[in-house]
Amino acid sequence: MSIQKAKFSIGDIVKHKHFDFRGVIYDVDFEFNNSEEWYQSIPKNVRPRKDQLFYHLLAENEEVTYEAYVSEQNLLVDESEEPIKHPLINEIFSGKKGSTYFKPSN
């Protein structure tokens, strides 16, 4: 297994390459770590490889907030600097600067 360099960091605001949602990264898996049922539910034309980083997001779209699990290949930087309006933001992060949220320093 080779060492992978993450394209994104915890706290980065990102958007999905194919679907209309954005979010902030709060955790990362170094390879696919979800159910096969979830994986097969992704349309084949955008189904990601399993051998890459997957990010946990506090996500939002125009209608709802939710948690998302997205492969690195399907994420782009969101340069809008607009805050994420997810209700769990303040439980995980203590502030925001530009397009990045930061965790509290202990």
Question: What name fits each language-model region?
Answer:
Residues 1, 36, 45-47, 79:
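Charge-rich, low-complexity amphipathic helices
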Residues 8, 21, 43, 54-55:
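Broad hydrophobic/π-residue packing in well-ordered secondary structure
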Residues 12, 41-46:
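Intrinsically disordered, low-complexity boundary segments flanking structured domains
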Residues 25-26, 37:
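Short amphipathic alpha-helical leader/targeting segments
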Residues 47-106:
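Intrinsically disordered, low-complexity, charged/polar segments
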